[in-house]
Amino acid sequence: MIKYYNRRNKDYDIEKVAGEKYLNWTYSSPIGMNLLEVFIKKKFFSKIYGFYCNKRLSRKKINKFINDFGIDMSLSENQSSNFKCFNDFFTRKLKKEARPVKADKNLLISPGDGKILAYKNLNLNSVTEVKGINYSFYELINNDSLAKEYDNGTCLVLRLCPTDYHRFHFIDNGICENTIKLKGFYYSVNPIALSKIPSVFCKNKREYSIFHSENFGDIIFMEVGATCVGSIIQTYKPNTKILKGDEKGYFKFGGSTVILFFKKNTIKIDNDILSQSKLGYETSVIMGEPIGSRK
């Protein structure tokens, strides 16, 4: 059971997890854990499932997925009958009015839909994940000199579950450098898995780029792959002018994570998100929603 904070009704909700029985079995049973290490965490497994999700045959999953998880298709640019395959549906674009972006340059917005955690006064040797698991920022970035620039800064971890909108966006005007790709495995990023596999973010396939934002300084913008995420697709054009709310890229099928790192004294995160993070609870947000402000 995954409990998260709903800031709209100021109460806790229970997340409806896609493939919950499979996740619990895989990460809780000896046989499941053996399969995970031998097969499921490998790129080959995610490529096989990704291949299926790109085929027309996978269309039969779409309507059941929509009904099971109550996905509001009135927000989508296309309706279910127009998608060519499950991945086409999964990476769907939303109508612009579905995710309005406030122009106020002082407002910090969420880069995507999902559940967010925030950590300030970043300790480079120990960043806390869901369920209290720690990992090293140095190991995550694999660049010690760059990591040191973010000492005592702020970290935002946005977890996208399979039922979420899976495109991620820029949070400010600016210019983004080329993407750096780091090889890794494909463990799930669901809290069920995070509690069983230490330092998942450091072990999984991930990509990051430096975003030179106009109002929040230089931001490390990282995407982390997960089980069945065959691809992290970057759609932005590096080293060109970017506007707040522009699409940066998207994940193909699976749960995934976006992580942002800010330098010291550049942003202030909303109190409800910070307080819930301290308690160990994620907060649900949508792309474009204000989550903080410029210092």
Curated annotation (Swiss-Prot):
Report the InterPro entries cross-referenced here: PS_Dcarbxylase, PSD-B, PSD_type2_pro
* Record PTM Pyruvic acid (Ser), positions in chain: 256
Q: Where is the active site?
A: 113, 169, 256
Query: Of which family is this protein a member?
Result: Belongs to the phosphatidylserine decarboxylase family. PSD-B subfamily. Prokaryotic type II sub-subfamily.
What topology does the record note for this protein and the membrane? Peripheral membrane protein
Keyword list (alphabetical) reads: Cell membrane, Decarboxylase, Lipid biosynthesis, Lipid metabolism, Lyase, Membrane, Phospholipid biosynthesis, Phospholipid metabolism, Pyruvate, Zymogen
Sites marked Cleavage (non-hydrolytic): 255-256
What pathway is this protein said to act in by its record?
A: Phospholipid metabolism; phosphatidylethanolamine biosynthesis; phosphatidylethanolamine from CDP-diacylglycerol: step 2/2
Please report the name of this protein according to its UniProt entry. Answer: Phosphatidylserine decarboxylase proenzyme
One GO cellular component assignment for this chain's record is:
plasma membrane
Molecular function (Gene Ontology), one example: phosphatidylserine decarboxylase activity
NCBIfam families referenced in this protein's UniProt entry, alphabetically: PRK00723.1 (NF001941), PS_decarb (TIGR00163)
The main location class comes to membrane
E.C. number: 4.1.1.65
Which chemical reaction does it catalyze?
Answer: a 1,2-diacyl-sn-glycero-3-phospho-L-serine + H(+) = a 1,2-diacyl-sn-glycero-3-phosphoethanolamine + CO2
The gene it comes from is psd
Q: Where in the cell is it found?
A: Cell membrane
